[in-house]
Structure formats: structure tokens, C-alpha cells
Amino acid sequence: MLFRSVWDETQWDREIHKAVKTLIHLRRTRTVLQRGRYEPAVVTPGGLFGYTRTLQDERMLILFNRTEQLQHISLPVDPQYRGHWRTVYPHEGTVANVGERWNLALPPKMGMIWEWSGR
């Protein structure tokens, strides 16, 4: 066979499949990810990329580490968005209490998403 069938589920990478399903679900259930204002948060030549999406009082931070190494980053935080941020991807529930700066460690080849949950 010249091309393998993408419909053959035995050939799927289950980890990627699960991640894509989770990201699709997040986008469908979070209006801020559909219509929120886009603002770049960080772009580095070394492979870090991030942005925020804001809609009324909702805000999400999306960060990607495209490098092969753990990356540390320190982001300034707007006064109105200081307080509690909760991870929503790749796992849900971890809460960070954020002040003037947010110091983060991003695993290699990983994307992470946080949701502002108030003060």
C-alpha cells in the first residue's frame, strides 16, 4: 500500500489523538477562545511563544515551548488580572496565585493553557 489509511484507528497515535480532542473541547466550551481579543504575551527567538485571549472579564494565557529544554519565563501581569490562575491544559486544576510577575517553567515541546479565575 502506497499510503496508509488515516482512518485505520490501529495506526493512530493515541496520545496526540487525546490531546487534540481535549483542545477541541476547550475551544468549543470557552467563548474567550473563540471570540476573545488576541494579544501576544511573549515571542522569543529561542522558541517560546505565547498569547492571551480576553473577552469581558474572562482571560486565558496560552504558552508554547518549542525547544528541547525546560524553559523558565517571567511575565508581567496586568493589575486587573492578578490573583488566581488555574491550569486547564494539559491537566486541570492546579491554581497559581499570581502577583506583579508570573514565573513559569515550561516543559520541552509542550503547550500549556491557564484560565484567570479571579482574586
Where are these regions (language model features)?
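Carbohydrate-interacting/catalytic domains
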Residues: M1-R119
